[in-house]
């Protein structure tokens, strides 16, 4: 119940938008102002569903598309565009998420105590849009230097967090306000459609935005500006749609901050109990009963109910702390894996679309299939047991992810740092080859023909780009080749015959600060085309040669 309106719990998986509203009636808090009754919005096709909710649902779909689309590519943006390491990228990603989860408190305070829900949504949505625009501009390589990109990105993310979190406690409650008190069934169905819009926006955006990032090239690389620009455009659409329905909305004035009243009640009860902690004073049934000298029995009863619910929520922060790693550590893990499904390559940041997809699939499966079957078996599968089962499954999922990560680390390619590079050799000649690189003591043993390369050898460079001299000996003959090596690169030196003599070719892959297990390279040498798949630190490499 929110300000006298019975709303349902809209807790979305990983969504800061869905705040838990304390069941405190409007009568518990003195209203600041009384306004005349609002004009009721016309019904949709003669039903009891107000036309105004259509604008709210469309707004929610576009806003969720905007938020999840931007967030899907955020970690890879930190790693590959800002060139941060994985630890820093993960820390900033979760700091942003934390701010998104905290700012609903600010939004609720503003809406309840000052502006009301409608104006709060409008003003903070404008802040939201500005943040998106700044974030998109910061992803354009030609705009400033590295420091400018970081400043623009952090400023944009701060505004986005304030905007997206600030409107969270308002939108769902504002939708509930549009219904008359007697239309409980219609209001409950509205929240079902509202939740569907949330997951539909999340599903489409987490699948599409990574395609815009990796499938479209701009400024000579992945198009992060487009990946952030499209969500920005959707947020502008969300704001315009919401404002369009202005004349149809039922707007309730701010009626005081309920959360503040609850906190005051709890503090007063604790202080009163401490002051009267004496054997001569009779004990009370519940510690909150010590607030009865100042607060109504109704408010005290409702606060008791709220504290009981909060006690059940104690394990939830641990669950969500793990769950939110889908966008950080799990996405980074996906960059080290082979996601080629018979020609369809799943982008690492696209993995997140599985969450809303499975939500939409499993909700009807569980509600109309599994749970009725459990009831037929006379198993008392209470909500608490469902929560416990979900947490156990989450633990098993992270155990599986840990095992996968250990296997990846065993075979992961090394990450070169500045003034450092790595090299390995593939011999396509018909006999053994002895190879030396001037200034380095590497490759002491002859390299056999078509031998799977050994582990990468490290090259310490004197500058960000250095020429190396490669000397090869084959059947009593020797030749020398010069190659340019960039810092922070992983190189494949290919030896092959050309006109009866041996020569070399280098194929390089520039590191972006993250480990890679699979590296597919293509080298064109005279009379043959080589496609080589390196599986780092493994003897399971393979090559295909087309003559």
Where are these regions (language model features)?
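Short acidic/polar inter-strand loop motif in beta-rich domains
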Residues: 473-481
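Hydrophobic transmembrane alpha-helices of multi-pass solute transporters/permeases
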Residues: 2-474, 489-516, 522-547
């Amino acid at each position: 119940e929110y300000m006298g309106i019975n709303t349902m719990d809209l807790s979305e998986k990983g969504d800061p938008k869905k705040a838990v509203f304390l069941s405190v009636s409007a009568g518990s808090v003195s209203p600041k102002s009384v306004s005349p009754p609002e004009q009721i919005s016309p019904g949709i096709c003669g039903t009891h569903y107000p036309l105004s909710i259509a604008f709210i649902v469309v707004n929610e779909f576009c806003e969720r598309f905007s938020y999840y689309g931007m967030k899907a590519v955020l970690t890879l943006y930190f790693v590959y565009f800002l060139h941060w390491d994985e630890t820093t990228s993960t820390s900033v990603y979760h700091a942003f998420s934390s701010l998104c989860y905290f700012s609903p408190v600010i939004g609720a305070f503003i809406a309840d105590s000052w502006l009301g829900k409608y104006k709060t949504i409008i003003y903070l949505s404008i802040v939201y849009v500005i943040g998106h625009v700044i974030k998109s501009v910061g992803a354009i390589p030609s705009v400033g230097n590295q420091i400018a990109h970081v400043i623009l990105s952090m400023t944009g993310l701060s505004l986005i967090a304030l905007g997206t979190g600030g409107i969270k406690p308002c939108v769902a409650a504002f939708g509930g306000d549009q219904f008359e008190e007697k239309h409980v069934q219609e209001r409950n169905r509205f929240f079902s459609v509202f939740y569907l819009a949330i997951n539909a926006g999340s599903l489409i955006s987490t699948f599409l935005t990574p395609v815009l990032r990796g499938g479209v090239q701009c400024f000579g690389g992945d198009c992060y500006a487009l990946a952030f620009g499209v969500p920005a455009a959707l947020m502008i659409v969300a704001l315009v749609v919401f404002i369009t329905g202005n004349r149809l909305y039922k707007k309730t004035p701010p009626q005081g901050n309920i959360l503040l009243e609850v906190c005051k009640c709890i503090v007063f009860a604790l202080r009163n109990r401490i002051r009267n902690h004496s054997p001569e004073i009779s004990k009370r049934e519940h510690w909150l009963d010590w607030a009865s000298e100042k607060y109504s029995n109704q408010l005290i009863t409702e606060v008791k109910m709220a504290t009981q619910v909060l006690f059940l929520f104690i394990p939830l922060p641990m669950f969500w702390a793990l769950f939110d790693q889908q966008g950080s550590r799990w996405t980074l893990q996906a960059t080290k894996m082979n996601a080629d499904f018979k020609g369809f390559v799943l982008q690492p940041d696209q993995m997140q679309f599985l969450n809303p997809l499975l939500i939409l699939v499993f909700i009807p499966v569980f509600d109309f299939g599994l749970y009725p079957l459990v009831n037929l078996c006379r198993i008392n599968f209470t909500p608490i047991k469902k929560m416990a089962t979900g947490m156990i499954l989450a633990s098993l999922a992270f155990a599986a992810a840990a095992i996968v990560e250990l296997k990846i680390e065993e075979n992961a390619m090394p990450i070169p740092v500045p003034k450092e590079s790595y090299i390995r050799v593939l011999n396509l000649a018909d006999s053994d080859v002895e190879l030396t690189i001037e200034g380095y003591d590497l490759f002491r043993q002859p390299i056999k023909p078509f031998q799977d390369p050994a582990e990468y050898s490290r090259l310490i460079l004197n500058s960000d780009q250095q020429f190396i001299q490669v000397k090869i000996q084959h059947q009593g003959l020797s030749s020398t080749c010069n190659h340019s090596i960039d810092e922070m690169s992983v190189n494949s030196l290919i030896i092959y015959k050309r006109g009866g003599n041996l020569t070399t070719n280098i194929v390089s892959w520039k590191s972006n600060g993250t480990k890679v297990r699979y590296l597919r390279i293509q080298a064109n040498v005279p009379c043959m085309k080589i496609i080589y798949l390196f599986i780092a630190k493994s003897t399971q490499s393979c090559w295909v040669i087309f003559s």
